[in-house]
Design a protein with these regions (language model features):
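Contiguous, glycine/small-aliphatic-enriched amphipathic segments in soluble metabolic enzymes
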Residues: 1-139, 181-266, 270-284, 289-300, ...
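FAD-binding core/adjacent interface of flavoenzyme oxidoreductases
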Residues: 142-157
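Ligand-binding beta-strand-loop-alpha-helix segment within the catalytic cores
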Residues: 155-185
Length: 363
């Protein structure tokens, strides 16, 4: 990238949901364009429609662009993609699903071309986006198919980072989808992300159990003894500071999670329910990929769409997180490419034990 400011792509999501509202509210502050160059992918007609529904938000002015390559510093670029004739707030329609996918594909096209530094995705409706050409159960799976790497869904905030072993699958399939090998791989991915994406020096990871009371020694399920604990032992042998398995209720209710830099949950709701309770304005980050993708941690919220009631803070945080992660990756790449700088760092840390290292990200 030749420009100093990062170019961050933002997709409209479902034009009948709250995507446009939170985008417009988040970008209304002129300081945002001082921080980065926004490139919005979506329907100009939907943008104009929702701009007129916001009573107390400063109107956002767009600069039309054919792609992110035409985006300019100090301007909010709008790449026309996923056009709709007339938004229908609160309605789940095939037209809105198509528009969400078209905007997403345009952003990923520019991301893969190197014209964007990261992408922030607006929420779409998982049912209406389905078609013969798009059969993914979520953004995470789509980005995993389009970009290099094995994606991991990490929910993150200033106080908490939760990774998932399984994502968008039925509860009935969770137990058979968990294996020792997968948990070890996911622990490695989570550790690498905590180091490279969040700047944690020597991350400690809590691993959640699958069954109530962590299986009670096998009385309430054998997964802890036969799968999860052996995975933790193997990962620890590889230098990953993984601990557990911990019963979910005890880990969160007692505040034990604060002693760890990351948490690995076995399934979607096990991780997201406590995360959203503790961090209502958190961010969804897709780790394990060559490129950076984040999103707000809420859905389309059809019930309040078009009513000027949506809170933009999670969208703001998703933008901030994308910027921070890109900067962390570049800083680490620069450091690891400089042998003298790396040698000095290693020398200064030579006599430091694990217990002396920072246990949380202090930034």
């Amino acid at each position: 990238m030749s420009e100093q400011k990062l170019k961050i792509g933002i997709t409209q999501g479902d034009p009948n949901g709250i995507g446009w509202e939170v985008i417009l509210k988040a970008l209304a502050d002129p300081r945002m364009t001082e921080l980065f160059t926004p490139v919005i992918y979506g329907s100009p007609k939907a943008a104009a429609y929702y701009r007129n529904t916001l009573r107390e938000t400063e109107p956002v002015q767009f600069a039309p662009a054919a792609s992110a390559a035409e985006a300019r510093r100090g301007k909010i670029a709008l790449v026309a993609a996923g056009e709709v004739e007339q938004p229908e707030p609160g309605r789940a329609t095939a037209e809105a699903g198509r528009a969400a996918v078209e905007a997403l594909r345009a952003a990923v096209r520019d991301l893969k071309a190197g014209e964007l530094d990261a992408v922030v995705t607006g929420p779409f409706d998982k049912e209406t986006v389905q078609s013969d050409e798009f059969s993914y159960t979520g953004h995470t799976e789509y980005f995993g198919a389009e970009l290099e790497g094995e994606p991991m869904m990490i929910m993150c905030s200033d106080r908490l980072r939760v990774g998932l072993v399984t994502k968008h699958i039925p509860v009935s399939e969770i137990a058979r989808s968990i294996s020792k090998e997968k948990i070890v791989r996911d622990l490695a991915t989570l550790r690498r992300s905590l180091v490279e994406d969040f700047g944690v020096v020597e991350p400690r990871i809590a691993v959640m159990a699958l069954n109530p009371h962590a299986g009670d020694g096998g009385l309430v399920g054998r997964e802890e003894e036969e799968t999860i604990r052996p995975a933790i032992v193997e990962a620890f042998g590889q230098g990953i500071l993984a601990f557990g398995p911990f019963a979910a209720d005890g880990l969160f209710a007692g505040g034990g999670y604060t002693r760890y830099d990351g948490i690995l949950a076995m399934y979607h709701d096990q991780g997201l329910a406590p995360f959203k309770t503790l961090s209502p304005d958190g961010v969804n980050f897709t780790a394990g990929l060559a490129a950076v993708r984040t999103s707000p941690d809420h859905g389309v919220a059809f019930d309040i769409a078009g009513k000027d009631q949506a809170d933009p803070q999670s969208m703001r945080n998703a933008i901030y997180a994308a910027i921070d992660i890109v900067r962390h990756r570049r800083a680490r790449a620069e450091w690891t490419a400089n042998p003298l700088q790396r040698a000095e760092r290693e020398k200064s840390n030579r006599d430091v034990s694990v217990k002396d290292l920072p246990q949380t990200d202090k930034e």
